[in-house]
Amino acid sequence: MTNSVFQGRSFLAEKDFTRAELEYLIGLSAHLKDLKKRNIQHHYLAGKNIALLFEKTSTRTRAAFTTAAIDLGAHPEYLGANDIQLGKKESTEDTAKVLGRMFDGIEFRGFSQRMVEELAEFSGVPVWNGLTDEWHPTQMLADYLTVQENFGRLEGLTLVYCGDGRNNVANSLLVTGAILGVNVHIFSPKELFPEKEIVELAEGFAKESGAHVLITEDADEAVKDADVLYTDVWVSMGEEDKFAERVALLKPYQVNMDLVKKAGNENLIFLHCLPAFHDTHTVYGKDVAEKFGVEEMEVTDEVFRSKYARHFDQAENRMHTIKAVMAATLGNLYIPKV
C-alpha cells in the first residue's frame, strides 16, 4: 500500500514537516513504544536494508537506529568514517547513487547539512538526518515525546534551553517547539545567541501556533515558570579548540539547583541529549577538571541525579521515535492523511 503522507519522504529538518505531521510521528512513536513494551512484533520494514552512515561518532544515535531497524524487521549496516568516502575520494552525489541502488533507506550523522540533503537528492530513497551541525531532527521527536509523556500535552508549555544557543540542538528545539506550540526560551550569552535566520524562522512558526520565542541572557527572565530545563555540552564536536573560551563563557549558564529553584515549578523536568559532563568519573571529565578547574560543566551532578531528571527516558525514546520515522517513510503502513 502507498503511504500518501510520509511514504518515500526524507527527514532532514523539522521545518520541512507540518505541525500535524510532527504530532502524528510523536503519536506513532508512543504507539510503537507500547508495542515494544508488550512484546508485540511490528515488522513494518521486513526485508529492507538500511545504511547507517556515521562521520561523527555516536552511542545513542547508532544504538537507536540499529535496534529500531531490527525491531522493524530490517537489516542495518553500519558504515563509519573509515568506510565511506563522502566528498573525499568520491562525491556525495556518486556515493548516494550507489547506496540508493543497494539500500532501501539511509541514515546520515555528520557535519554538513548540505551533505545529507545531497544524499536525499541523489539516492532515490528516504534519508534520515541523525545529526548535522545545523539540525538534529530525530533528537527532537524523542525530546518532545518525553515532554508529552510527563505533562500529557505540549501546547502552552515552556521549555528553556541553557547554554550554547547556536548549536544544532538549540536550533532544533527552537524551531520544533515553535511549530508544536511550545514556548521556547534560549538562555545564553549574547556571543552565542542563535543565528538571526533561525530566530526569524522560529518566530514565523510561533505566530502560527500561538507559542512565543525568547532569547535572553537574563536567568530570571529565562526560567520563570519553566516546565522543562534543557542543556547540552558546551563544546560541540569539531570545536574542541574553543574549550577554555566556552568554559569561561558558559559557567553562568550551568543548570544547577539554584536555577531549578529559580524556575519556581516543582513539577518541572530536566532533559539532556547526552553525553553529559556532570562529574569526573570519565577520562574526559578528569582531563577537563585538570585543565580548566571545573568538575561539573553544563549540569551539576545534583541536578543530573535528581527527581527532575528524565534524560534516560529521553535517551530510550530515541529508539521509539526513530522507529516511527523509518516506519512511516519506508514501511508498509497506510496513512492517507494526518
Swiss-Prot record:
Top-level taxon: Bacteria
Keyword Cytoplasm: yes
Gene3D superfamilies reported for this sequence: Aspartate/ornithine carbamoyltransferase (3.40.50.1370)
Residues that bind carbamoyl phosphate: S58, T59, R60, T61, Q85, R109, H136, P137, T138, Q139, C273, L274, R318
Catalytic reaction list: carbamoyl phosphate + L-ornithine = L-citrulline + phosphate + H(+)
Main location: cytoplasm
Enzyme class: transferase
Pathway(s) it belongs to: Amino-acid degradation; L-arginine degradation via ADI pathway; carbamoyl phosphate from L-arginine: step 2/2
Known function: Reversibly catalyzes the transfer of the carbamoyl group from carbamoyl phosphate (CP) to the N(epsilon) atom of ornithine (ORN) to produce L-citrulline.
Family: Belongs to the aspartate/ornithine carbamoyltransferase superfamily. OTCase family.
Protein known as: Ornithine carbamoyltransferase, catabolic
Annotated organism of origin: Streptococcus pneumoniae serotype 4 (strain ATCC BAA-334 / TIGR4)
Lineage of the organism: Bacteria, Bacillati, Bacillota, Bacilli, Lactobacillales
